[in-house]
């Protein structure tokens, strides 16, 4: 089950438990966010395409973190005139984990993440030199 959502002027294909990076969203880390602009939805059997949007389908996510990208340098130089301009820009972004896609009576929820515990390595005794 997946959906295509629109946020920040871009489109993203999302499924439950996906992690996507989008333009800045309001809210603190851990807050829930709902995406209302759903363009396409499929549950494996049938596909619904909006004209342009679908109604009755909800995509819910959780804000993981906010951040900024690497600095992009814009450098202008006019030759032989000792004229230079150096300007930098860093774009803000938000990382979101999709928790649920719901359509009518069908729901696709993200399963809890399984974390592996580091198993202690079997300690081998040093070989005795005889």
From Swiss-Prot:
Belongs to the bacterial ribosomal protein bL21 family. InterPro entries: bL21-like, bL21-like_sf, Ribosomal_bL21. Part of the 50S ribosomal subunit. Contacts protein L20. The keyword Cytoplasm does not apply. PANTHER family: 50S RIBOSOMAL PROTEIN L21, LARGE RIBOSOMAL SUBUNIT PROTEIN BL21M. GO terms for molecular function: rRNA binding; structural constituent of ribosome. This is Large ribosomal subunit protein bL21. Keywords: Ribonucleoprotein, Ribosomal protein, RNA-binding, rRNA-binding. It holds the Pfam family Ribosomal_L21p. It comes from the Bacteria. HAMAP family: Ribosomal_bL21 (MF_01363). This protein binds to 23S rRNA in the presence of protein L20. Residues 108-120 have a biased composition (Basic and acidic residues). GO terms for cellular component: cytoplasm; ribonucleoprotein complex; ribosome. The gene is rplU. One of its GO terms (biological process) is translation. Coiled coil: none annotated. Residues 103-130 are annotated as: Disordered. Residues 121-130 have a biased composition (Low complexity).
């Amino acid at each position: 089950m997946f959906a295509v959502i629109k946020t920040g002027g871009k489109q993203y294909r999302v499924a439950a438990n996906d992690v996507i990076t989008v333009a800045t969203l309001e809210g603190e880390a851990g807050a829930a966010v709902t995406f209302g602009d759903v363009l396409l939805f499929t549950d494996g059997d049938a596909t619904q395409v909006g004209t342009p949007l679908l109604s009755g389908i909800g995509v819910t996510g959780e804000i993981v973190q906010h951040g900024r990208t690497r600095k992009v340098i814009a450098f202008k130089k006019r030759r032989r005139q000792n004229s230079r301009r150096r300007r930098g820009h860093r774009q803000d972004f938000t990382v979101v984990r999709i928790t649920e896609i719901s359509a009518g009576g069908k729901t696709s929820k993200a399963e809890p993440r399984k974390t592996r515990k580091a198993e202690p390595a079997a300690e081998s005794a040093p070989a005795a030199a005889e």
